[in-house]
């Protein structure tokens, strides 16, 4: 008994003590006033869950009406946002069509410029003293066939210093 925890002893004293008759009746313990030499018998309390009758039906109706309200709100929000997005989608389609035309022109100019780059020295459009830093740089300074047009188309519609050809060169 000396090795028991003090809180366990306190609880045992409160339940088994002389002033705990009311507590024993509330908890459901059997009053055990027995003499010396006999064993005490305690019955542990039983906790029973009880169901409330009548309120359950109203609670499920409240939940059901809340779910209907939530579904209606979501549906109306989706309908409004779909009609609002229609203008944005039309704007994106128009911009995509414009970009496609510009990109087709760029693709055609780049293929011609790639052909010209292969033969710039042979055609004489990019000679030695002028092409010291490369024909790309020469095309920015003076007109080189196909390459200058390719650079101009590549930078069309963009900020002058944000163009891919102008990373290290400022006009």
UniProtKB/Swiss-Prot annotation:
Transit peptide: first to last position: 1-49, 50-86
Modified residues (N-acetylglycine): 87
UniProt keyword terms in alphabetical order: Acetylation, Chloroplast, Membrane, Photosynthesis, Photosystem I, Plastid, Thylakoid, Transit peptide
The keyword Lyase is annotated on this UniProt entry: no
Name of the protein in question: Photosystem I reaction center subunit N, chloroplastic
Family indicated by similarity: Belongs to the psaN family.
Pfam families to which the protein is assigned, alphabetical: PsaN
Protein function: May function in mediating the binding of the antenna complexes to the PSI reaction center and core antenna. Plays an important role in docking plastocyanin to the PSI complex. Does not bind pigments.
Record text on subunit structure and interactions: Interacts with GRF5, GRF7, GRF9 and GRF10. The transit peptide is the site of PSAN that associates with 14-3-3.
GO BP of this protein: photosynthesis
Lipid bilayer topology: Peripheral membrane protein
Gene Ontology terms, MF aspect: protein domain specific binding
Main localization (coarse): plastid
One Gene Ontology cellular component: chloroplast thylakoid membrane
Other observations noted: The N-terminal Edman sequence is 2 amino acids down-stream of the N-acetylated terminal peptide identified by mass spectrometry. This suggests an additional processing.
Record-annotated membrane-spanning stretches: none
UniProt subcellular location: Plastid, Chloroplast thylakoid membrane
